[in-house]
Amino acid sequence: MKENPFYKHFIAHIIILALGFAMIYPILWLITASFKEGNVIFSDPSLFPEVWTLDNYIKGWEGIGIVHFSTFFLNSLFICILCMIINSLFASLTAYAFARLKFPGRKIWFAIMLITLMLPGHVTMIPRYIIFNMFGWINTFYPFIVPKFFGGDAFFIFLMVQFIRSLPKDMDESARIDGCSKFGIYLKIILPLSMPAVITTMLFTFLWTWDDFFSQMIYLNSPSMYTVPMGLRLFLDSTGISSWGPMFAMSVVSLLPCFILFFSLQKYFVQGIATTGIKG
């Protein structure tokens, strides 16, 4: 008996929809819970509230104490935008050197860089803290921004090296014959053609910096310097009195830049991941 493909595809789509709903349900619950009154968030089992209210957003945006949540939001945007631009620029420069230029010890340095991918971030956390403390950078944004100038993110360098190696070298030779310098080749040929990988780097840098809590907790100790993850922590009280409603509301607000950035750059993001062969 011949198997009916309709039922096969129907069952497959049902399973995919069920898995998709299971993955997106926590976000849906977070969004709807942010519109519930504080005393029914955990007692009301329904997904949609009976009474919709914006009080959580108003109270959450007012922040904790004298510091408004807008301060945390702007601090995060400032750090993320600078890190995104600087990291993509200097990571692409470093990747161009590894992929196109010939210099002594290139393979050795590239191998050493790849080895650093195996090191947990916590291994270098204490040495970095000691160095930044010697520089007087504690409670400043410098520990997050300055290291990006040195192309120290091995993951993004490796991603861009893979992309640049896939580009034909004939264009480099033609530009060199026309008198273009090595930096000119990078600026006029390699960088424009590598925009999918550059945008992928920018997107990942923004998301990882925006979500970073551990590093920001170590280096920032003044509420006026707090970022969004640190600001959300202020809604939780160790005594048991926590402002869940405002925290959920500000969590929804904190997701907006990530959603906007991802969906606006989704085409380049998918192209960069597919071309470099990197899987999430």
Please state what every model-predicted region is.
Residues 2-280:
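A structural signal for multi-pass alpha-helical bundles of membrane permease subunits
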